[in-house]
């Protein structure tokens, strides 16, 4: 029996009433994963034994009636550390790495008696927008298996969209939660920088990375964020802000709210069908009582260039730790210490990772630091100031999550610039450290289209409020791909 059409609250009621046990739910989830895995390839590791052991222990202890997450399976992106479960970052460099500790986000999930069911596929070290740079496999879009799921958290998005799991965790450095959420027709949120601890997240761009939730609905997404968020002494960038319940504003009306629609987000390079969908969504918000007005974010056009200088520079520093000495892959044919470093990194990293290491090393070099890295930091400040000016007068910003719907496999992975431009609408949010959500807003040629809502720092409750108002008065989130029993 499958329970993948049940909401978290419905599953909780079944568990509390003992209509099902945690072991039965875990076994059913494992069956859902296996039944769909060959078609979509969401997972790198399926933690059958560990998950069933945890579920049995929970049944012995008893389900907490006051904890809606007790016994709920959770898929985790494979760059988030899980003690005793392979954590590869989808790289040959870490193909055999088992952490001896849990990431704080995972530890928080365990504290709520959630069950880690497996580790999801991703772009190698989270560097990519299609989940095609993984060392292990290419994940497929849940709606069309000839298309990409987005990236870098493609496995986490597809696992939810295809009905393998109800909840998953991803990470977002330049759009890596929101873009795959849009491509797969699910809800994905990138929290405020510092709202969720980065401890245990394998670092890509340390000033940009954030762990965040995927779910089929806005409420379930907010429920998962309530579990993983919070201040953490182990992360020096963790914010001293504690919000106990991110669902608190869901269900409240949005009459009188002012929502900005940047003209740059619907300009050149945006698929006309995407633009049409977003404008229709804006009209829908007006019917709900919100005030929609056009604004300008003039420096957003520089976001991609700024991001790839800053992110690559930070990556070139972060990835220095992977040298074949302490853990992970080591080249077998090395004859000296220098040989170990050179051959291990040459053989262990994929092409996209090596490209970004070289770009970052160049940007940080003494002759080019001022011209590139320093200048990028200055433009980043201008992008932040653009957002601050808008949020002085508006509650949220509305726009598309991605300029197109999901593209075909093997079309952009050989064109780095085109792939980078696919993140043009999500990148500015990371540069400014803001929260943003992608929710299903319609379809273009049978493929899901994502609507992005951006808020000022620590406005996740308001973002969820507005997103839920849209969701409650539309049915896009209810439509499912054929692999999940839908008719598309």
Curated annotation (Swiss-Prot):
Cellular component per GO, a single term: glutamyl-tRNA(Gln) amidotransferase complex
Active site positions:
77, 152, 176
The answer to whether keyword Endoplasmic reticulum applies is no
Q: Name one GO molecular function term.
A: ATP binding
Going by the entry's taxonomy, the superkingdom of the source organism is recorded as: Bacteria
Q: Which InterPro entries match?
A: Amidase, Amidase_CS, Amidase_dom, AS_sf, GatA
On whether Ligase is a keyword of this UniProt record, the answer is yes
GO BP annotations of the record are: translation
* EC code(s) of this entry: 6.3.5.7
Q: Which PANTHER family match?
A: GLUTAMYL-TRNA(GLN) AMIDOTRANSFERASE SUBUNIT A, TRANSAMIDASE
Q: What does this protein do, in the record's words?
A: Allows the formation of correctly charged Gln-tRNA(Gln) through the transamidation of misacylated Glu-tRNA(Gln) in organisms which lack glutaminyl-tRNA synthetase. The reaction takes place in the presence of glutamine and ATP through an activated gamma-phospho-Glu-tRNA(Gln).
Quaternary structure annotation from Swiss-Prot or TrEMBL? Heterotrimer of A, B and C subunits.
Q: Which HAMAP family match?
A: GatA
**Protein's name according to its UniProt entry:** Glutamyl-tRNA(Gln) amidotransferase subunit A
Q: Which organism is it from?
A: Streptococcus equi subsp. zooepidemicus (strain H70)
Q: What is the lineage of its organism?
A: Bacteria, Bacillati, Bacillota, Bacilli, Lactobacillales
